[in-house]
């Protein structure tokens, strides 16, 4: 059985492991962080009266629901097995 010559191109292609997008501009650098303005305090929570709608946010039909209310009610619920009813 005669051995066929191994092509260098195939051996390079088989061993290469480059992630997708590695050759894009800016690849390899971590994403830039947005710098906050020094005049705003990040730790101060805004009251509902001070909150302004976010531009580009969709307004869904129906009433606005407070998520914390739902979570509180859900935590008060208790599982009752079928035999105890």
UniProtKB/Swiss-Prot annotation:
**Record keywords, A-Z:** Phosphoprotein
Q: Which residues carry this modification: Phosphoserine?
A: 36
Please indicate which superkingdom the organism of origin belongs to: Eukaryota
Looking at the record, which segments are called Disordered?
19-63
- What InterPro entries does UniProt report for this protein, alphabetically? Chisel
Q: Which cellular components does GO assign to this protein? A: contractile muscle fiber; costamere; cytoplasm; M band; muscle tendon junction; nucleus
Tell me where in this chain the PTM Phosphothreonine is found.
47
Family, similarity comment:
Belongs to the SMPX family.
Say what the protein does.
Answer: Plays a role in the regulatory network through which muscle cells coordinate their structural and functional states during growth, adaptation, and repair.
This protein is called what? Answer: Small muscular protein
Q: Source species, please?
A: Rattus norvegicus (Rat)
Gene name on record?
Answer: Smpx
